[in-house]
Amino acid sequence: ERGGQVEIIGWLYQYYNTEPKAAAFAKNGKITKEEIPAVTQLFTPDWIVRYMVENSLGRLWVEGHPDCGLKENWKYYLEEAQQEPEVQAKLAEIRKEYAALNPEDIKLIDPCMGSGHILVYAFDVLMQIYESAGYSQRDAAKSILEHNIYGLDIDDRAYQLAYFAVMMKARQYNRRILNGENTCHVYAIQESNSINCAHLKYFGAGMDDIEKNAAKMQLEGLLDTLTDAKEYGSILNVESYNWDLLRRFVAAEDTDGQISMDSVGVEDTAEQLNRLIDIGETMARKYWVTVTNPPYMSISNGDSMLNEYVRKYYNDNKADLFAVFIERCTNMTQINGYQAMITQHQWMFLSSFECLRKIIKDIEITNLVHLGARAFEEIGGEVV
């Protein structure tokens, strides 16, 4: 089965992290930002990925395009229960919004993508959506990379695997896709700490003073936000800047043909800035679909910087990282969009998650599966 190929990548990477994970727990201290990927990396079984994607991305399309005939292909798709007439009327209005969507309008993100398992299956479902709308596989593969799939992770090596998996999936449908330049919105979250801010004066050549100053101010704001970004990952709250303006500012580089000690490394700085702009825009966007298996870690086990950030921005859900991610993913998802997550089940009954339950009460739950123990062989006795 094709799905097994990406599963192998994920399992190999999880077992690669076994020793670093054991070492992090054995030291009996706070988990550092370097250790968080190994400690929280947990590969999502294929059937759970399919269930989440089919009932979020798949449902979004099917509810707006009921005659597309796709849901018959989805083993884990659950039909909606019969609703009261008042609810049916509200749903009919929402589905008008879905019906107006074209395939390229649907942006999906996995903000904790790991090795990319969720993104790869989402690619398959998106391909079915595009084909049902009359696209060829070749054109659809390019469009999915450019318009639909987004992913983030704090782990650089996981990013490399996810990028590889997504591009190989694209090549499955378009054998020439690696021959040209293609946009792939899959990123390892990077920090701005190493940016040489003295180089900013070399950018914005040819722009008028108002635009140039606005771009510089916004870029400095982004760099400030992304300081120590690997401590926080996708829970970082990024403002929605004028991303086109920032890209034009960085592209308009001018050192007057002079090479000085001060200008050495400007091209490297431009490359770093463009990467940070891409990451920032991805974190600031709203998505029609958010699907992820978030990290499970008590915030008290994190270092002081993570603790302080969570208390400042997610104080109501500071018990565990998975609760923080429920709130964050809710904020990343458009109104009437779909959010699919695997979480531990404590949020349903423990007093420390009471505020989270209030957030969830304001969201319509389409379906929920209580898996019980041993859904993940690696988590002894835990329930999701």
PLM feature segments, named:
Residues 48, 275, 324-328:
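Well-ordered alpha-helical segments embedded in enzymatic catalytic cores
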Residues 102-109, 118-285, 289:
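Class I S-adenosyl-L-methionine-dependent methyltransferase module
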Residues 5, 138, 239-242, 266, ...:
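Generic alpha-helical segment signature
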Residues 15, 225, 249-252, 276, ...:
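Residues that form generic nucleotide/phosphate-binding pockets
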Residues 43, 267-274, 316-324:
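Conserved phosphate-coordination/catalytic loops
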